[in-house]
């Protein structure tokens, strides 16, 4: 029950004899790829049969028969791109200089809105890392004109307007400026409703779109933000049905689809490129667009190199021979490269993908393939943290243990380059807590025990694996994290607890039916219903969705609170990992079965460049 959802516990499981003949001999999976296809499709099912074991007695196992790796290693190694040529980088550098000049050429009538629009555009296009100083200067300027009624379009504006105020509220809050949502009260009518016309002009629709986007960065107990979200959601749903298909309608649909907590920056950049000329008609948007496309494709060339490295790691580690586990390393890398597009952060992206894949492998071992005796041995081996601990492990576990051991130590080496100290003890503590939480779930299933909601939820926040996926990758970033600051990010900090809780709850709402069909009863839904006799499944889901909504607001506060002494970049990366994983659970469990949304994400953000 980790970062991904698996089948039920091993002690009641079985393995297909044709796939693995014994724990000593793993037959390699024969993988092929059709030249006209980028992925293979498969339908998961459950196989039940006996397989031979080390002992005289046969071991009964259950295997979830997950579909094979969709992204063949031969295909990955064959990828090529022309965008590594120096001429593309040289052209991008010239455009960066020209775009910096655009930040300065603004008139007094709409200079506030123009500055906000520039900041928003470079961020949504994924090129903001080149303009950190310009963004800060622009937002300092806007904030200097902010008052209790918001702002107008320009410094000479005598009245505030909703479009500029909503955009400023969201942008300033995301950058840590102390702005109050109370300004929105000034845009209500005498009946306490947000004022709007019945005509729904394009300008008004854009204002309500910015109001909707602002409402998503709400803090706890901000009633006006709740009202803004409800009102703008209803308004935009009606508007998108009436206006013709256009850049505006596409932006409404995208923002209502992904919001903020499931939005991925690189996916948004790809989407926004097609519409930003229409969004910024009063600026030289062509330069921004050309720069964004160049940067997208230059980073695409780096993605290919990193993906080849990851695919070789997956193949050389022997994971391709473990036919009972899910192979989602390409999907995990895609998520990593959708939230961090800084070329210097290769260790972060690859580390996140590797950690997530290890979590998936262990999830399939603990939830599906391993027996209780095997799981106890593996848990003890993790706590010893010594290659000699593999002596008593079954053959298939020996290889997995060594990959975990070597990868975690390798990541600690990368972290030492950034942190200037050995951080392996943090990683070991995280892995021990993670494995212990797995064993607790294994014992619940083995004994037929259904824990209380609170007990399941607290354990599930650890077993989800968020701590493992975050800890070592953020330590590789070029931001020193001394012990007292790191404690505010890692478990059991408030920040980490909120992130883990959100993902555990969201994951369970997407996985519980499939898990229950495979015999695994414990979930937030079943535990809530057991604690509250008479509660229906719908009652449980409503309760959990309400919990998630409140936790999201608290999470916003932990990330954005103005007195935050933790480096923003570190918390932002941890927050973005939450967004990435949450994205996979938007409609269903996108990790057990790689659905079309996940496949398309890989293609549009990693495999395909944009036309220049």
Curated annotation (Swiss-Prot):
Q: Which SUPFAM superfamilies match?
A: Terpenoid cyclases/Protein prenyltransferases (SSF48239), Terpenoid synthases (SSF48576)
Q: State whether keyword Transmembrane helix applies.
A: no
Binding-site residues for Mg(2+) 2, renumbered to this chain: 363, 367
Position of motif DDXXD motif?
363-367
Per the record, the pathway is: Terpene metabolism; oleoresin biosynthesis
List where in the cell it is found.
Answer: Plastid, Chloroplast
Q: What is its EC number?
A: 4.2.3.108
Keywords of the record, alphabetical order, are: Chloroplast, Lyase, Magnesium, Metal-binding, Plastid, Transit peptide
Cytoplasm keyword on record? no
- Top-rank EC class of the record's enzyme: lyase
Which GO BP annotation is one of this protein's?
green leaf volatile biosynthetic process
Q: Where does Mg(2+) 3 bind?
A: 515
Q: Cofactors per UniProt? A: Mg(2+); Mn(2+)
Any one annotated GO CC term: chloroplast
Q: Which reaction does it catalyse?
A: (2E)-geranyl diphosphate + H2O = 1,8-cineole + diphosphate
Please quote what the entry notes about the protein's domains: The Asp-Asp-Xaa-Xaa-Asp/Glu (DDXXD/E) motif is important for the catalytic activity, presumably through binding to Mg(2+).
Q: Which PANTHER family match?
A: OS04G0344100 PROTEIN-RELATED
> Which family, according to UniProt?
Belongs to the terpene synthase family. Tpsd subfamily.
Stated role = Terpene synthase (TPS) involved in the biosynthesis of monoterpene natural products included in conifer oleoresin secretions and volatile emissions; these compounds contribute to biotic and abiotic stress defense against herbivores and pathogens. Catalyzes the conversion of (2E)-geranyl diphosphate (GPP) to 1,8-cineole.
Instruction: Give the protein's recorded name.
Output: 1,8-cineole synthase, chloroplastic
Q: Native species of this protein? A: Picea glauca (White spruce)
What is the taxonomic lineage of the source species? Eukaryota, Viridiplantae, Streptophyta, Embryophyta, Tracheophyta
């Amino acid at each position: 029950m980790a970062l991904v959802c698996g089948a039920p516990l091993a002690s009641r499981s079985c393995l297909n004899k044709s796939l693995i003949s014994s724990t000593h001999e793993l037959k390699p999976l024969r993988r092929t790829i059709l030249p006209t296809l980028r992925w293979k499709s498969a339908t998961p099912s459950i196989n039940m049969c006996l397989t031979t074991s080390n002992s005289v007695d046969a071991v009964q196992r259950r295997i979830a028969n997950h579909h094979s790796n969709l992204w063949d290693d031969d295909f990955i190694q064959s990828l090529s791109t022309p965008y590594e040529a120096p001429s593309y980088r040289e052209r991008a550098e010239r455009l960066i200089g020209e775009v910096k000049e655009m930040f300065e050429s603004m008139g007094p009538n709409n200079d506030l809105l123009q500055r906000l629009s520039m900041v928003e555009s470079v961020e949504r296009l994924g090129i903001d890392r080149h303009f950190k100083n310009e963004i800060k200067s622009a937002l300092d300027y806007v904030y200097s004109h902010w008052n209790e009624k918001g702002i107008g379009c320009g410094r000479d504006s005598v009245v505030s307007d909703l479009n500029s105020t909503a955009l400023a509220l969201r942008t300033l809050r995301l950058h840590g400026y102390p702005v109050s949502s109370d300004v929105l009260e000034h845009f209500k009518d005498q009946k306490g409703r947000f004022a709007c016309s019945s005509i729904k002009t394009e300008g008004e629709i854009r204002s309500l779109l910015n109001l909707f986007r602002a409402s998503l960065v709400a803090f706890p107990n901000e009633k006006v933000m709740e009202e803004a979200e409800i009102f703008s959601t209803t308004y935009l749903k009606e508007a998108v049905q009436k206006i013709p298909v256009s850049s505006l309608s596409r932006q409404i649909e995208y923002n209502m689809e992904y919001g903020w907590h499931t939005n991925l920056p690189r996916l948004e950049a790809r989407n926004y490129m097609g519409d930003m000329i229409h969004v910024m008609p009063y600026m030289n948007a062509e330069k921004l667009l050309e720069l964004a496309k160049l940067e997208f494709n230059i980073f695409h060339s780096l993605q290919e190199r990193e993906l080849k490295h990851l695919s070789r790691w997956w193949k050389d580690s022997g994971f391709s021979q473990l036919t009972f586990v899910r192979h989602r390393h390409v999907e995990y890398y895609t998520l990593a490269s959708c939230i961090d597009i800084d070329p210097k952060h290769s260790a972060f992206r690859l580390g996140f993908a590797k950690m997530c894949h290890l979590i998936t492998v262990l999830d399939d071992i603990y939830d599906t393939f391993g027996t209780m005796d095997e799981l106890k041995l593996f848990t003890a081996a993790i706590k010893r943290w010594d290659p000699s601990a593999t002596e008593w492990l079954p053959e298939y576990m020996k290889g997995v243990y060594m990959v975990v051991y070597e990868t975690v130590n390798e990541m600690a080496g990368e972290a030492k380059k950034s942190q200037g100290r050995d951080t392996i003890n943090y990683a070991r503590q995280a892995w021990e807590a993670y494995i212990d939480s797995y064993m607790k779930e294994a014992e619940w299933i083995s004994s037929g025990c259904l824990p209380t909601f609170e007990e399941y939820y607290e354990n599930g926040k650890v077993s989800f694996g968020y701590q493992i996926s975050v800890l070592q990758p953020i330590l590789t970033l070029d931001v020193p994290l001394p012990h007292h600051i790191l404690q505010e990010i890692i478990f059991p900090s408030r920040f980490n607890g909120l992130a883990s809780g959100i993902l555990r709850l969201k994951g369970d709402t997407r996985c519980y039916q499939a898990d229950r069909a495979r015999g695994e009863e414990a979930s937030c839904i079943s535990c809530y219903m057991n604690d509250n006799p008479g509660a229906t499944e719908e009652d449980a889901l409503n309760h959990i969705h309400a919990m998630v909504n409140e936790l999201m607001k608290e999470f916003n506060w932990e990330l954005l609170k103005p007195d935050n002494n933790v480096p923003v970049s570190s918390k932002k990366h941890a927050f973005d990992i939450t967004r990435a994983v949450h994205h996979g659970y938007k409609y269903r469990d996108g990790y057990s079965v790689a659905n079309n949304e996940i496949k398309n994400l890989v293609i549009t953000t990693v495999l395909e460049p944009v036309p220049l």
